From Swiss-Prot:
It is found in: Mitochondrion. Residues 33-46 have a biased composition (Polar residues). Its EC number is 6.3.5.-. It is an enzyme of class 6 (ligase). It catalyses: L-glutamyl-tRNA(Gln) + L-glutamine + ATP + H2O = L-glutaminyl-tRNA(Gln) + L-glutamate + ADP + phosphate + H(+). InterPro entries: Asn/Gln-tRNA_amidoTrfase_suB/E, Asn/Gln-tRNA_Trfase_suB/E_cat, Asn/Gln_amidotransferase, Asn/Gln_tRNA_amidoTrase-B-like, GatB, GatB_Yqey_C_2, Gln-tRNA_amidoTrfase_suB_CS, Gln_synth/guanido_kin_cat_dom. This is Glutamyl-tRNA(Gln) amidotransferase subunit B, mitochondrial. The lineage of its organism: Eukaryota, Fungi, Dikarya, Ascomycota, Pezizomycotina.
Length: 604
């Protein structure tokens, strides 16, 4: 049972929409939060925002991102070669990091209106009156948005609060038409959680085999409009994103290395994806992180500052809007080094907000204490408390899917899969879990195809290699995103089955995969027959003839093998047999056996 106690408010007022300072990316269709029909705003006048900067924008701001990254990486390498940035000494300093993660929930409805939360629709096509803060409109909490948020909190071992409330966080910016964001500052729906990071998660060596990171709280909040800046200093706003449901996950400052911080964000993303709580990961913009960084001298004992109940810390700075795992790690490294350099020079660290640019070597100041915003948090008078029943929590706990740690152990230890540690980790992290689902489908189909071969199935590792490396290589080469329909699981299973039965060679299997990947609609069996890919083994006499020919052409190498014992050169002869013979019919193992027999026998 989930219910919300609604507060009373006067009747709706009728006002004309006056959108000041914004230009809608497209005319939008209003979708009311009340059942009063759909109104078309497509004829509404467009209003533009023209903000002039004090200084002209340089052309470098419009350089393609790929080129910028290449240039920045090149400059970074050059600086290292010149020795202009000697590495800081960190042994005498303790780094402390806390992380705030914002994740888009996977829901059909927005948080406070019945408008669709679809991601890729036409700009400004899913907008309710409340989303654009039309005077008189009220928020209407959608209980369905709480379900993925609860799954996320339970997966991170949080205590679910039976009663939670919403607050207003006041600030003025173009992407927030109401002048405030609705969040859960004082009474969040989940508190006191934790996650466990292990060695395979990529934690720092000094953290040993594992480290536990506390979760202070998880709170629900509404997203803001999507803003696009044009070269003319005009901003286009897409209000589709307003009131999409987010959760903010706040960790305790218990992280002491950049690598472990990145591993923490990576692990939280994997947890959210495993329980179906989020739309996409960091790669697609569905998750972003802010990090709080402080350092203190180990020899001087505890610092003077406190953060989320943890005392004895140094003065912290916050780095906003990090959008990749690498950005999290690199930004923390840069800020750690900056703070150490300032303190060693006799300076002090200011409690400020800083930014980070991908490929940069240092953080940049955004605003200091004097520029900090007073958000004037206050309870939202239009929203009553959210009451969560025990029945809902119990039902979600019973239906909880496997979490990343359990998935990892299953992929590594289950005889059905037997993946390496690296492959298991990669499989879990890729493509929001879709690659893992595809892999499991291929394995299940292959088991069905090979019931006649052996009671002990051992093809899981081979399937992992094909899914991650062969198919993954084709995706990388073609710069295409993951799509399980491009090579159906049935087709890949049939290719691997033919290869394991030695009915086709490895090169033929790769050719088959490439043809299916490129859109060949024929069945795998039909392609094999049409393209004459079925393996026909050479006879012993044919192997001997080929071996004798390559030996006759290379007598010096034969002598080196016989007289000097350079057996490694036999592999070169195998390659020559494949070159002069039919590569699709040559089995390397048989070719090597014949070569050893002919070369070494004559030497005995």
């Amino acid at each position: 049972m989930i219910r919300q106690c609604l507060s009373r408010r006067g009747a709706y007022s009728r006002y004309r929409l006056a959108a000041r300072g914004v230009e809608l990316a497209e005319p939008f269709h209003h979708q009311s939060s009340r059942p009063q029909g759909r109104r078309n705003w497509s004829s509404s006048p467009r209003c533009s925002l023209d903000i002039r900067t004090d200084t002209p924008r340089s052309r470098s701001e419009y350089v393609p991102l790929r080129k910028q990254l290449k240039e920045e990486a090149k400059a970074k390498r050059a600086a290292k070669r010149k020795g202009s940035a000697p590495p800081a000494k960190h042994d005498d300093w303790e780094l402390t990091v806390g992380i705030e993660i914002h994740a888009q929930l996977d829901t059909d409805a927005k948080l406070f209106s019945r408008a669709s939360a679809a991601i890729d629709d036409i700009p400004n096509s899913n907008v309710a009156l409340f989303d654009i803060a039309l005077p008189g409109s009220q928020p209407l909490f959608q209980p369905s948005t709480l379900i993925p948020a609860l799954r996320a909190a339970l997966a991170m071992n949080c205590d679910i609060q039976r009663v939670s409330r919403f607050d207003r966080k006041h600030y003025f910016y173009q992407d927030q038409p109401a002048g405030y964001q609705i969040t859960q500052y004082y009474e969040p729906y989940a508190k006191n959680g934790s996650i466990w990071l292990q060695e395979h998660d990529g934690i720092a060596r000094e953290d040993g085999e594992g480290v536990q990171i506390g979760i202070k709280q998880i709170q629900m909040e509404q997203d803001t409009a999507k803003s696009q800046e044009l070269p003319s200093s005009t901003y286009l706003l897409d209000f589709n994103r307003v009131s999409r449901p987010l959760i903010e996950i706040i960790t305790l400052p218990q992280i002491h290395s950049p690598a472990t911080a990145a591993a923490c964000v990576r692990k939280i993303q994997a947890i959210l994806q495993s329980v179906g709580a989020v739309t996409t990961g960091m790669e697609m913009g569905g998750l972003r992180a802010d990090v709080n960084v402080s350092v203190r001298k180990r020899s001087e004992g505890a610092g003077d500052h406190e953060y989320h109940g943890i005392v004895g810390l140094g003065q912290r700075t916050e780095i906003k809007n990090l959008s990749s795992f690498k950005a999290v790690e690199d930004a923390i490294i840069a800020e750690r080094d900056r703070q150490i350099a300032v303190l060693e020079a006799g300076g002090t660290i200011e409690g400020e907000t800083r930014g980070w640019t991908l490929g940069s070597t240092e953080t940049r100041k955004l605003r200091g204490k004097e520029g900090e915003v007073d958000y004037r948090y206050m309870p939202d008078p239009d929203l009553g408390p959210v009451v969560i029943g025990e029945d809902v929590i119990c039902d979600l706990q019973m239906k909880m899917p496997l979490l990343p740690d359990a998935l990892f152990q299953m992929l590594v230890r289950n005889p059905k899969y037997k993946l390496s540690t690296a492959d298991a980790k990669t499989m879990i992290e890729l493509d929001d879990g879709q690659r893992l689902e595809y892999y499991q489908d291929v394995v299940d189909i292959l088991i069905g195809l090979q019931t006649d071969l052996s009671a002990d199935f051992s093809g899981g590792k081979a399937v992992g290699n094909w899914v991650l490396h062969e198919l993954g290589g084709l995706l990388t080469k073609s710069s295409l995103p993951w799509d399980s329909g491009r090579v159906p699981a049935q087709s890949l299973a049939e290719i691997i089955d033919l290869l394991s039965r030695k009915e086709i060679t490895s090169s033929s299997a790769k050719s088959l995969l490439a043809m299916v990947f490129d859109g060949d609609k024929r069945s795998v069996a039909q392609i094999v027959e049409d393209e004459n890919l079925r393996f026909q083994s050479l006879s012993r006499g044919e192997y001997i003839a080929l071996a004798e020919e390559v030996m006759r052409q290379n007598p010096k190498m034969v002598s080196e093998i016989r007289e000097k014992g350079q057996l490694g050169k036999i592999g070169w002869f195998v390659g020559q047999i494949k070159r002069i013979g039919d590569a699709n019919r040559v089995e390397a193992q048989k070719a090597e056996e014949i070569l050893r027999e002919l070369i070494l026998k004559k030497n005995s």
